Swiss-Prot record:
Protein name (Swiss-Prot/TrEMBL): Mitochondrial distribution and morphology protein 10
Extra facts: Present with 768 molecules/cell in log phase SD medium.
InterPro entries reported in the protein's UniProt record: Mdm10 (IPR027539)
Gene: MDM10
Cell location: Mitochondrion outer membrane
Magnesium listed as a keyword: no
Coiled coil: none
Amino acid sequence: MLPYMDQVLRAFYQSTHWSTQNSYEDITATSRTLLDFRIPSAIHLQISNKSTPNTFNSLDFSTRSRINGSLSYLYSDAQQLEKFMRNSTDIPLQDATETYRQLQPNLNFSVSSANTLSSDNTTVDNDKKLLHDSKFVKKSLYYGRMYYPSSDLEAMIIKRLSPQTQFMLKGVSSFKESLNVLTCYFQRDSHRNLQEWIFSTSDLLCGYRVLHNFLTTPSKFNTSLYNNSSLSLGAEFWLGLVSLSPGCSTTLRYYTHSTNTGRPLTLTLSWNPLFGHISSTYSAKTGTNSTFCAKYDFNLYSIESNLSFGCEFWQKKHHLLETNKNNNDKLEPISDELVDINPNSRATKLLHENVPDLNSAVNDIPSTLDIPVHKQKLLNDLTYAFSSSLRKIDEERSTIEKFDNKINSSIFTSVWKLSTSLRDKTLKLLWEGKWRGFLISAGTELVFTRGFQESLSDDEKNDNAISISATDTENGNIPVFPAKFGIQFQYST
């Protein structure tokens, strides 16, 4: 389940018209969400509230071998945050959990081509207005969190410098480990490219990220299928100035919709040349209540590979649809007595007297469009050829919009998430839903590998719900055991 402060951060981006889908950090967010979702490792309780329209608080408790907790505070001067924030009772489940990310390629436009976009998309209009607005107001966000009993601290500051630029500062401080790390981000988003310059005090790490969108300009036809597809290529480069250790990777992402069903799908291909790691993912919405993802990893140096699968199954609320259907069945037809359809009535005669004869009006129009026969035949052939293509494109767009509207109008009550890996031989199960105003997440991670307990670190062993002895593992008495189990409750007002 998405933490409360992450919901506030997402609302801040929405209110300031900052798109996170162009970030290279989130280029593989869909596959990570479906495969690497987090399993609670203990009993966790989070209570949050909005004290003022600009301040938010959150209190966390967890029982992981001992009672731990944290206190968070967030302040933002962005206006209309309440339009994007909802409490745990009113928020839709698909907005409160991490799930398949549907991209909006229409948002990827440059300033020069912004005038060519359709005015039907209100989000595009808002972004276009923001780009050309000379009265841009700088907005800020301040976040702090303190953990206890460890007294660790973390903080974040976000400053919108202009409609296209943003500055971010993150810091972590640990008194126990004598660790103090400060990371600075400067981001520039031109909607065709998003560039990030990063500097961290840890090892004096310097980084650069860039993401370029290829399919950004709509075609001449506003109903073109290209408005629902996008191709993005990104890369990142790192260098530690102290240890002189480099790092780099590149990723290609393609997002589109099925022309027959309108269901979205995302494909990514990542490559790390230094470590020889290649990763490819395929994610698709197989239905309004189901999602599937597959990932294949391969290393060129060690010749090792891995295949992972993930899926989601959503449960809808059906009684509202049945109620509307019953109400529609009770509607009675309009009685003929309410409409005067007598041709001899005075109202009908007055209507015929005032309405002109359209046939005579058409005949009175002079014939100024006399076209030769061969040109008329060529025009008819072109009209027939293009009309069939445009009709097909319009049908595809209608199918895509119907599928998206069906998902947005659905009311989901719970979701099951499953993920497995053939090399690690693990199975993760997670259930998320709503109950009496609470957002609940409960899950477990099942392990099928012997000797798994010995491969864990001391912290991971303490996080396990059940401790398995080495004797039982070697004898095969417990071939399958839960390596992690927990439940999380969230409540916000």
